[in-house]
Amino acid sequence: MILILLGPPGAGKGTQAKLLSSELGIPHISTGDMFRDHKARGTEIGKQVQAIMDAGGLVTDDITNAMVKERLSRPDVAPGFILDGYPRTVVQAGYLDGLLRSLGRSIDRALSYEVPEELVVERISGRRSCPRCGAVYHVSQNPPHRAGFCDRDDTALVQREDDKPENVRKRMQEYGTKTEPLKRYYRDRGELSDVEGVGTPEGILAVTKKVLGR
């Protein structure tokens, strides 16, 4: 099964992708993880990604497409896979369709997780991370025992630049402009299902499985 997960930043796509990956036994492919890998290794792509994300922007199609093509060449995707964070534009969707056709494959379902904008801003702007160990907290949903400091190593927590409210809203605007047309693209092909993205992860998973006939 090949699934595409759509939705704004903070919609819970990553959480659902991990749960679905476990349920279906297929890999979760996150463009965010691929971007972070390139940044950590200091590649030229990684440097470009860092500059764009620090400004709250979206990474260009050519960079993203190249990383996705490489990832889909690996043998673990043979039984299927879940794409989280890609495609973001109709252009990327067209590229993906062509890539899958060349492999004799096609997507089964595009799932669009629907979440109100202010809830997205609250979810993302409340995130805090430890620069030393990478632990992630949330000021209201998952706070550290000592406010502002990591439970593991007592390092002062930081808010990522692209998690600040003004940058979250900017990303939402870009999402609406570039990514919303994807819903029309997949709906016109009869491949789109909307999923309510408000609730517990387990509850949303149950709805998702029902949509998939599982």
UniProtKB/Swiss-Prot annotation:
Where AMP binds, per the record, is at 31, 36, 57-59, 85-88, 92, 160, 171
Kindly indicate whether the keyword Transferase belongs to this entry.
yes
Reaction equations catalysed: AMP + ATP = 2 ADP
User: Pathway membership of this protein?
Assistant: Purine metabolism; AMP biosynthesis via salvage pathway; AMP from ADP: step 1/1
For the ligand (ATP), the binding residues are 10-15, 127, 136-137, 199
Question: GO biological process: any one?
Answer: AMP salvage
- Spell out the protein name for this chain: Adenylate kinase
Gene Ontology cellular-component terms listed: cytoplasm
In terms of Pfam families, this protein maps to: ADK, ADK_lid
UniProt note: domains: Consists of three domains, a large central CORE domain and two small peripheral domains, NMPbind and LID, which undergo movements during catalysis. The LID domain closes over the site of phosphoryl transfer upon ATP binding. Assembling and dissambling the active center during each catalytic cycle provides an effective means to prevent ATP hydrolysis. Some bacteria have evolved a zinc-coordinating structure that stabilizes the LID domain.
Q: What family does the entry list?
A: Belongs to the adenylate kinase family.
Where in or outside the cell it occurs: the entry states: Cytoplasm
Role, per record: Catalyzes the reversible transfer of the terminal phosphate group between ATP and AMP. Plays an important role in cellular energy homeostasis and in adenine nucleotide metabolism.
Q: Name one GO molecular function term.
A: zinc ion binding
Annotated region (LID), positions in chain: 126-163
Residues that bind Zn(2+): 130, 133, 150, 153
Q: What class of enzyme is it?
A: transferase
Q: Where is this region: NMP?
A: 30-59
- Subunit details: Monomer.
Name the keywords, alphabetized.
ATP-binding, Cytoplasm, Kinase, Metal-binding, Nucleotide biosynthesis, Nucleotide-binding, Transferase, Zinc
The highest taxon in the source lineage is: Bacteria
Originating species: Anaeromyxobacter sp. (strain K)
